[in-house]
Design a protein with these regions (language model features):
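Extracytoplasmic thiol/disulfide redox context detector
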Residues: 2-89, 205-214
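Loop/turn elements at helix/coil->beta-strand transitions in domains of secreted/extracellular proteins
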Residues: 45-48, 76-79, 105-112, 142-143, ...
């Protein structure tokens, strides 16, 4: 019985990896993904997946719970990084600064989802830094520390670098996913967010094969 269970388990694992390889083999450039040329700088040792997003984007708000769960289940050879973009819109640039400021103060895990809710469900007015800081203070974080981070030059620099990265990846809308610095997953090839993540899995499998992995 133990040998039978072990055999069944091995068969399932084999089928899982073969499925990923088959999906990768079925991918078509232009239809399922767009090559990023020139490629973005790649991380050594790991396949980096970038999610370009904005707190101001309602689609990003809907996508956030799903992509967060998906990212937590990725293998050790995959790293996940979020990139807030502004598309040179001042109101979105402030939202990008909110993300980086929360990250800098260690409060991102606590308030990340809350920012989406505040904007898209509670219709909070985040048109000034003062309004943002007052809201954050009401959520129990250090207002002085967060306010200083939000207004710092380093946050502005991070926003600029994030926008430059989005431009280099040829991002025209969000949410958008780039894989291994070389492939931009085509949202139009997916009918919904679940399919988008499955397509992303296939592109990751392609990148893994190209790196010599299985």
């Amino acid at each position: 019985m133990k040998r039978l269970i072990a055999l069944l388990f091995a068969t399932l694992i084999s089928a899982f990896f073969l499925s990923g390889q088959t999906l990768a083999a079925d991918l078509q450039a232009g239809r399922d993904y767009k090559p990023i040329n020139p490629p973005l700088p790649a991380t050594k040792g790991k396949i980096e997946v970038l999610e370009f997003f904005s707190y101001g984007c309602p689609h990003c708000s809907d996508f956030h719970p799903m992509v967060s769960q998906w990212a937590a289940k990725q293998g050790k050879d995959v790293s996940f990084r979020r990139v807030p973009v502004s598309f040179n819109r001042p109101e979105w640039a402030r939202l990008s600064r909110i993300y980086f400021a929360l990250e800098a103060t260690g409060d991102l895990a606590k308030l990340d989802t809350a920012v989406f809710i505040a904007i898209h469900e509670q219709r909070m007015n985040f048109k000034t830094d003062e309004a943002v800081v007052a809201w954050a203070a009401g959520k129990g974080i250090d207002a002085k520390k967060f306010g200083e981070a939000l207004a710092s030059f380093s946050m502005q620099s991070k926003v600029q670098r994030a926008d430059q990265e989005a431009t280099a990846a040829r991002i025209s809308g969000v949410p958008a996913i780039a894989v291994d610095g070389k492939y931009l997953v085509n949202n139009e090839a997916a009918g919904n967010y679940e399919e988008l993540l499955k397509l992303t899995d296939a592109v990751i499998a392609k990148a893994r094969q190209e790196r010599g992995g299985k």
